[in-house]
A protein has these predicted regions:
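Charge-rich, low-complexity N-terminal segments
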Residues: 1-193
Length: 193
């Protein structure tokens, strides 16, 4: 009989001292992918606006050690386990570590509104299970791996915040640009006369 698969779903936040580092997410994903392959760990990492949700599964000792390392990593703060337990088989046996930039999801219809408000630290067990179910469904039915659709972008947390604000308020900003151009035209005509 096979040993049960141990899993942890946890949330954390990016430490403020890494907000301007444009490579921190890419480095986290590369490091996680490599280490997970070595230790037989599978799962995924979702991130958005400095918040993380990670699901890891594998042999109990490997998962416990990995989670201990994550808690000591200075890039993570406010680490909190949302779900923990065992199951008969892996949910994501082909994913050494899929990293998904949820900010890329804003304009996509690929996933449901489960991700509309990505704030895992406020989620209870039901919401966390709903998100796991959504990712599992996508994993089983998508022809394109999730991280190929939403790859990590080489941009800092501050850059992501500015991009999100610009996307959210693009109509207002376009109107302001139109007013500025009109004012410049009026000023230019007045100045020339």
């Amino acid at each position: 009989m096979n040993e049960p698969v141990y899993y942890i779903t946890y949330t954390s936040r990016l430490s403020m001292r890494y907000f301007l580092d444009t490579q921190v997410i890419h480095e986290l994903c590369e490091q996680a992918h490599h280490n997970n392959q070595v230790h037989g760990v599978t799962g995924f990492l979702l991130f958005r606006q400095g918040r993380f949700l990670q699901y890891i599964e594998g042999q109990r000792d490997a998962i416990k050690q990995l989670y201990s390392n994550i808690q000591r990593d200075p890039r993570n703060i406010d680490t909190q386990i949302l779900l923990e337990g065992t199951r008969d088989e892996r949910l994501f046996d082909q994913w050494a570590m899929h990293c998904v930039d949820m900010a890329q999801h804003d304009s996509s219809e690929d996933m449901s509104r489960s991700f509309a408000k990505f704030d895992p630290q406020t989620w209870g067990e039901d919401k966390t299970c709903e998100v796991l179910h959504e990712i599992k469904h996508f994993y089983e039915h998508s022809k394109t791996p999730l991280n190929d659709i939403y790859p990590p972008q080489p941009i800092s947390y501050v850059g992501l915040q500015v991009r999100a604000l610009a996307r959210q308020h693009s109509s207002f900003m376009m109107l302001q640009v139109a007013f500025l151009l009109a004012a410049l035209c009026v000023f230019g005509v007045t100045y020339l006369l």
